[in-house]
Swiss-Prot record:
It is an enzyme of class 2 (transferase). Residues 1-27 form the signal peptide. It comes from the Eukaryota. This is Probable receptor-like protein kinase At5g61350. It comes from Arabidopsis thaliana.
């Protein structure tokens, strides 16, 4: 930095001049500065002043089996950052694993900037290229594809490098990889701190220096694009126009960049150049006494990561000190209360920045919302708020990845720990299951042909075989008597409507309950009658019709999320009737209420029977036998199988877990809580949707791709199966790290032949080995890493029924051997010789 000063006679003069240059310009000369225009034959000089070495000059850095390059004269791209477009006219192509290796002269953080554009090549279609890019410690891109030729792809990272930094390009099987340009550049130490404020507010987040970062958004608020030529670290700052959610409420403010000052020990031009601090957005009606909105910017991000967020402020709107005080919010959570810039900088027009780490749990809709707004009830100053710039960077996850759940070794590092699929085995199993399903359909057809004439009265087919569409059901008067079609029930009650009357009336929900009847049924909604609480409100036990117990779900008007899920549950249950789905009896919407009435499940959720009893409970819940557990799993599988295949349009439950499997007085299992359910697509394999569900049960592929299929329910059910077997929570953070996630821990032990180590000790010695083997086999298939490798619920049901047959057969044999351990062979009748259960739509 500062040039060669050896001709100065005094070392003191050298030091003074050096400090002067640093102070005045905050210039930075990187110790490592590798700029490569891949595939080019000549050096490329950009208009921003940077020189990229040609491919020939950089060949020493590359190790690859084949020398494949391509180039064009021009590309059909008009980009606002035109200075880098020459880099996309050439490319290196890799048919196999290839490596760029760079020697690092000064260890520390480095930029890794990657440029992609799929050029034409006579032998390779780069638009179809799929590949991964990693360093020795971090996955930068996993199964990446640049897509079509409509836009360039630029990726930017901050990675720690020691003596050598290697970039590995790994094409997907049968594909290629490519790269147009690579930048490896040293970064000032002060650019990223080791700690930052936490959001939600908590002790500071520490240890940032150990994380790799991907820069997702770098935005110049209130101004135009800032090119690398202006930024001392060659960064690009984009305009905030695409991100401003309410531009009508904001006003651009601009001052001369030369008037911006940097405080001692605070922000420098290396943190952000002065053009960033010289522009801002303020509130358009800042002169009003109480503006009733916030300035807001929304940026898309990925799920499953924490985010480093840097906000840039500079008071360029006030006429005097202490005239601007405002609040800062990130994802509607308080980040800074009553921010007074002048008290922090002691001057106007002075740069200031604040750093935060946003917890991954706060990201519910795939975006980050940054807001600033005036502090209410100001004693002095004018109600106003500003923001000058913002940066959002993704932190690597526990897999050491910035893109997905695979580690640098290519192994899956998600919730179940990298199981590999065996295609031939899956194909064989699939064939057998398909054949079994076909035979089941034949059996159904034969039964249909042989049905008795009075089949409707005798009910040869159970009423739950086919869906009962509520739009064709009858209204049963709450006073009893004959039924009559209820065409409209709201015409005379408009004054009492809660705003959802039209929604309810179109659903044909059956029995209508007056509010007074439900008050009586619950003793005026007595708190002692509460048997459950959720986002929708409370569930009460009540009695109707002279003693019939029911569950009464009373929606809370204060919860928007609960109301949305409440409506979804109405829509779903109005379509469905099945022995293994909780039945909807009726509803009430008087007095601004939203109340649903269900059949009462006296034995509560399955989870309570597995590990719900408290220690030293005087009335503990009896332990479920292995046979009972199998029957409960079979019933639940039947309910889910019906959801997926039995309705006119398949339904994906999306929240399968043991608290949503309820048991009646006979321990018959019924699936409940359809608040998160989605209709399956009619013509596509998945539904693109925001990720929802319960931690520990969530399908990692759904989490990763945000594409919901019925196989997501299958994954969750696989977790349930292990929960039933082991009788412990699916997530227990108090256990050692390798034991926290039940599904992952169980699969690891199963692969080692040590699964008996965590089986519920209350049933150890009662499970036949064949039954256990078939049960665990079903659970393992459900937890396959890719949905395409998981069985359907019908096939899972078949395996569970088979496991039950094996258990029953074993129980009939008088064993002379000791049955106290799981290591003793308990199946005198081999599983292979058992008669397979006939399979049909349950």
């Amino acid at each position: 930095m500062g040039g060669d000063f050896r001709h100065f006679s005094s070392h003191v003069s050298l030091l003074l001049l050096f400090l002067l240059i640093v102070k005045s310009s905050s210039s930075f000369t990187p110790a490592d500065n590798y700029l490569i225009d891949c595939g080019s034959s000549d050096e490329t000089k950009l208009s921003d002043g940077r020189n990229f070495k040609s491919d020939q000059q950089s060949v020493a850095f590359l190790q690859t089996d084949e020398d494949i390059k391509t180039s064009v004269d021009s590309i059909p791209i008009t980009d606002s950052n035109a200075s880098t477009l020459p880099l996309y006219l050439t490319a290196r192509i890799f048919a196999g694993k290839s490596t760029y290796s760079f020697y690092i002269s000064r260890p520390g953080r480095h930029w890794i900037r990657l440029h992609f554009y799929p050029l034409n090549h006579p032998l390779y279609n780069l638009t179809n290229s799929v590949f991964s890019v990693t360093t020795d410690t971090t996955v930068l891109l996993h199964d990446f594809s640049a897509g079509d030729t409509s836009s360039i792809v630029f990726k930017e990272y901050l990675i720690y490098a020691a003596e050598k930094l290697s970039l590995y390009f790994k094409p997907h099987k049968g594909s290629t990889a490519f790269i147009n340009a690579v930048e490896i550049v040293s970064v000032p130490d002060e650019l990223v701190p080791d700690s930052a404020s936490s959001v939600p507010q908590a002790p500071d987040f520490k240890g940032l220096s150990s994380f790799s970062l991907e820069i997702l958004h770098r935005i110049n608020i209130g101004g135009d694009l800032i090119s690398p030529k202006i930024d001392p670290l060659s960064r690009t700052w984009l305009s905030d126009k695409p991100y401003n959610t309410f531009p009508e409420g904001s006003r651009n403010v601009t001052v001369d960049p030369s008037t911006i000052t940097y405080p001692d020990g605070g922000a420098t031009a290396l943190i952000a150049p002065n053009p960033v601090y010289a522009t801002a957005e303020e509130m358009a009606d800042a002169q009003t006494s109480q503006p009733n909105f916030n300035l807001s910017w929304r940026m898309s991000v990925d799920f499953g990561h924490d985010y480093f967020i840097r906000l840039h402020f500079c008071d360029i709107v006030s006429k005097s000190l202490n005239d601007l005080i405002f609040n800062v919010f990130i994802n509607k959570l308080s980040a800074i209360s009553a921010l007074d810039l002048s008290s922090l900088t002691s001057a106007l027009g002075t740069a200031y920045y604040a750093d935060f780490v946003l917890n991954a749990s706060t990201i519910t809709n795939g975006s980050i919302l940054v807001q600033v707004g005036p502090t209410p009830n100001l004693q002095s100053g004018k109600p106003n708020a500003i923001l000058n710039g913002l940066e959002i960077m993704k932190l690597n996850n526990a897999a050491g990845s910035l893109d997905g759940l695979f580690g640098v070794d290519g192994k899956y590092k998600g919730p179940i720990g990298g199981m590999s699929s065996k295609k031939l085995a899956i194909a064989g199993i699939g064939f057998v299951m398909a054949l079994t399903a076909f035979l089941g359909v034949v059996v159904l057809l034969v039964r249909w042909q042989r049905r008795p004439k009075d089949w409707q009265k005798q009910n040869s087919f159970s009423s739950w075989l086919l869906p009962l569409h509520a739009s064709h059901s009858s209204y049963i008067s709450s006073k009893g008597g004959s039924t009559s079609r209820r065409m409209s029930i709201f015409g005379s009650k408009k004054s009492k409507s809660n705003g959802f009357s039209s929604f309810f009336s179109n659903q044909g929900l059956g029995r209508y309950f007056p509010f007074t009847e439900l008050q009586t049924a619950t003793q005026n909604f007595d708190e002692n009658a509460v048997c459950g609480v959720g986002g929708f409100g409370k569930v009460y036990i009540g009695e109707i019709d002279g003693g019939t117990q029911v569950a009464i779900k009373r929606g809370s008007q204060s919860s928007e999320q609960g109301i949305n899920e409440f409506q979804t549950e109405i829509q779903m249950l109005s379509k469905l009737r099945h022995r293994h789905l909780v039945s909807l009896i009726g509803f009430c919407d008087e007095n601004k209420e939203m109340i649903l009435v269900y059949e009462y499940m006296s034995n509560g959720p399955l989870r309570d029977h597995l590990y719900g009893s408290k220690e030293n409970d005087p009335n503990p819940i009896p332990t479920l036998s292995w046979k009972q557990r199998l029957e409960i799993c079979i019933g639940s599988a039947r309910g889910l199988h019906y959801l997926h295949t039995g309705a006119a349009q398949g339904i994906i439950h999306r929240d399968v877990k043991t608290t949503n499997i309820l048991l009646d007085e006979n321990l018959v299992a019924k699936v409940s809580d359809f608040g998160l359910s989605k209709d399956a697509p009619m013509d596509e394999g998945h539904v693109s949707t925001a990720v929802k569900g319960s931690f520990g049960y969530l399908d990692p592929e759904y989490f990763r791709r945000q594409q919901l299929t019925d196989k997501s329910d299958v994954y969750s059910f696989g977790v349930v199966l292990f929960e039933v077997l082991c009788a412990r929570p699916v997530i227990n953070p108090q256990l050692p790290r390798e034991q926290v996630n039940l599904a992952e821990y169980a699969m690891n032990l199963h692969r080692k032949g040590m699964l008996e180590k965590i089986i519920d000790p209350k049933i150890v010695g009662t499970i036949s080995k064949g039954s256990l083997r078939k049960f665990v086999e079903a659970a393992e298939k459900c937890l396959a890493e890719y949905g395409v490798d998981r069985p359907g619920m019908g096939d899972v049901l078949w395996n569970l029924e088979y496991a039950l047959q094996l258990q029953e057969a074993s129980a009939q044999v008088d064993l002379s051997e000791d049955k106290t351990t799981m290591n003793i062979e308990m199946d005198l009748i081999p599983g292979e010789e058992m008669q397979s259960p006939s399979h049909s739509i349950p």
